[in-house]
Amino acid sequence: MFLHSLHLQHFRNYRDQTVQFQAPKTILLGENAQGKTNLLEAVELFSTLRSHRVSRDRDLVQTGAESALLTAVVERDSGEQQLQIQLQQQGRRRVQRDGEVLRRQLDLLGSLCSVQFSSLDLDLVRGGPQQRRVWLDRLLIQLQPIYAHLQQQYGRVLRQRNALLRRAESLDLALLAPLNWQLAQLGVHIMRRRSRAIQRLVPLAAHWHREISGQREQLIVAYQPSVLAPDDTDEAIAWQERMLAQIEARRAAELGQRTSLVGPHRDDLNLSINGTEARLQASQGQQRTLVLSLKLAELELIEAVLGEPPLLLLDDVLAELDLRRQQQLLEAIANRFQTLITTTHLSAFDQSWVETAQILTVQSGHLQSEAVPMAPSSASLHKSLDS
């Protein structure tokens, strides 16, 4: 897939800006707080319907405006599509594809896929379980758009159940029974999908980690569900029964803490290098290698599932990588994936890489083109992939 253009109206610090992407690699050059990351955030919204920076749509709408309008033109193997998201200061979003208003915004998922890599991704290693769950969920939303619907349903049941648990003194336990069943049913659907995604991701990430570490390190990524699958199987009914039994066993603790303690909202991932938990003992260099390996594995997995390469969004990440890791990343992506990369300077880039990139200078929400190589088609991206 290839993103040909973005039109941003009253989005963040962009009042009315059209961006034409005309090369496999686009460098967004500018000082901090000029709008480089905002542009990547717009692409992220089309990919996941979420921002990793804020949770409220009104925070994305330019100050003084009632709404923001984002329009993307994307070329897929099946043809060109126009995607549109309207964000409101007050009220619900509205999404369109090729001029048709979509009844459910989730139906836009899968139209434009991307992998984002920023300095914040180091929290995958050193942060808490929530950071790792969010990363895995964002991947799954693009691999299986139905996953976003499962998450919504699970979140609704979880909130209802927690509201009851907060009334512990006067709670009629019979009210929990139907919610327990729904939580187990939806929770197992989520855990099965997470487990299968990790199974496919692990060999790809392990390969990249060996390559980047010069064959010196072995990466192991282990999914740690809140409820273990019975007898090394992910058969749904047996897993649900085990989750219900665990909920019953934790009833006293849940009533005491007034919150749900069992389910995929308590999952984690264990990341280890050469048998040692990375969060505890990995050096900064090893942590960066690990995250870079996961991101390259994400790219390959999305491409394998969708049959088309996703976009790669690099948000000022080269500053976090030493020269060797930078070179490995740039060699890995080459012209294989359309790449948007933000930076404050060009000195970190190989000159030949800069010469083939489109360079856009970003200043206070305005873009100016510095270099404009010929735009490739989606088919030519596939051709470079096969060569």
UniProtKB/Swiss-Prot annotation:
Its main location: cytoplasm. ATP binds at G30, E31, N32, A33, Q34, G35, K36, T37. GO terms for molecular function: ATP binding; single-stranded DNA binding. Gene3D superfamilies: P-loop containing nucleotide triphosphate hydrolases, RecF/RecN/SMC, N-terminal domain. Keywords: ATP-binding, Cytoplasm, DNA damage, DNA repair, DNA replication, DNA-binding, Nucleotide-binding, SOS response. The keyword Zinc does not apply. Pfam families: SMC_N. The keyword DNA-binding applies. GO terms for biological process: DNA replication; DNA synthesis involved in DNA repair; double-strand break repair; SOS response. GO terms for cellular component: cytoplasm. It is found in: Cytoplasm. InterPro entries: DNA-binding_RecF (IPR001238), DNA-binding_RecF_CS (IPR018078), P-loop_NTPase (IPR027417), RecF/RecN/SMC_N (IPR003395), RecF_2 (IPR042174). The RecF protein is involved in DNA metabolism; it is required for DNA replication and normal SOS inducibility. RecF binds preferentially to single-stranded, linear DNA. It also seems to bind ATP. Belongs to the RecF family. This is DNA replication and repair protein RecF. It comes from Synechococcus sp. (strain ATCC 27144 / PCC 6301 / SAUG 1402/1) (Anacystis nidulans).
